[in-house]
């Protein structure tokens, strides 16, 4: 009975998630706390950001929706900084044994001018469930650009999952694991201790989705974050601490009907 209930809830959550962020494209906890915009914050939403990284980075995240372990997303990856073409590898898993979504992603970025960077990514998303006799997947691509008119301002534009090609069982509707969307956003370091970020998104399900976030840095090692996202309205809150090359981030998102989702992330930069 529990498995049946969880499967029904999974289908419902998948439906709710189509409009903006699919179950597999969960950003790092910093970005999630800032409203989950991401187009100027994480290479997962904009591969061009790889070109602006100054260090290599390993990371791992755990995000639990609504305190239900079967709705957890686990992700990890590595961003490699080099002078030729910075690259990244990301792996994500959502669900549990009876229902599993997986993502394997490779991305590249390149600074093409003093103020411009361009990036592309290729990913394979896989859906496996006891409800289906066969698995189903999608191969898709992302493209993104970043423009920095001045040192403390960045703007970004990315197109996610375009194009997208279905593999495996064609009778399974798996569009939610590779939902097409276009994002445009900015971040602005107003002063040394405050950063604001905002994103507008157009997707297959929602004409416009918006997010806004703010990060306050009372100390170099400690950061407090808050954000909000529309469709539906979801406020978020989080914090981060850095020590000896390690970043530890926590975050939570509140949904008026389904409750609180929480997560933790750890990264090492060198």
Regions found by a protein language model. Give the residues of each.
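Cleavable N-terminal export/targeting peptides
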Residues: 1-29, 269
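Subset of outer-membrane beta-barrel
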Residues: 21-270
């Amino acid at each position: 009975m529990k498995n049946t209930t969880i499967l029904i809830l999974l289908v419902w959550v998948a439906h709710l998630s189509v409009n903006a962020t699919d179950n597999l494209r969960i950003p790092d906890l910093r970005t999630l706390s800032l409203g989950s915009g991401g187009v100027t914050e994480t290479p997962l939403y904009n591969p061009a950001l790889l070109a602006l990284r100054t260090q290599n980075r390993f990371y791992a995240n755990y995000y639990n929706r609504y305190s239900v372990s079967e709705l957890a997303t686990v992700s990890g990856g590595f961003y490699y900084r080099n002078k030729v073409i910075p690259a990244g590898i990301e792996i994500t898993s959502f669900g549990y044994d009876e229902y599993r979504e997986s993502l394997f992603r490779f991305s590249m970025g390149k600074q093409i001018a003093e103020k411009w960077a361009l990036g592309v990514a290729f990913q394979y998303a896989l859906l496996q469930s006891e409800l289906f006799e066969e698995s189903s997947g999608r191969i898709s691509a992302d493209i993104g650009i970043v423009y920095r008119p001045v040192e403390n301002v960045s703007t970004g534009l990315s197109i996610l999952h375009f194009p997208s090609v279905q593999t495996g069982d064609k009778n399974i509707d798996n569009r939610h694991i590779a939902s097409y969307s276009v994002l445009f956003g900015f971040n602005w370091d107003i002063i040394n201790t405050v950063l604001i970020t905002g994103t507008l998104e157009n997707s297959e399900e929602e004409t416009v989705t918006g997010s806004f976030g703010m990060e306050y840095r009372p100390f170099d090692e400690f950061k407090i974050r808050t954000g909000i996202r529309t469709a539906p309205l979801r406020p978020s809150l989080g914090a981060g601490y850095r020590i000896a090359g390690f970043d530890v981030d926590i975050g939570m998102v509140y949904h008026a009907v389904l409750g609180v989702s929480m997560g933790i992330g750890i990264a090492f930069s060198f």
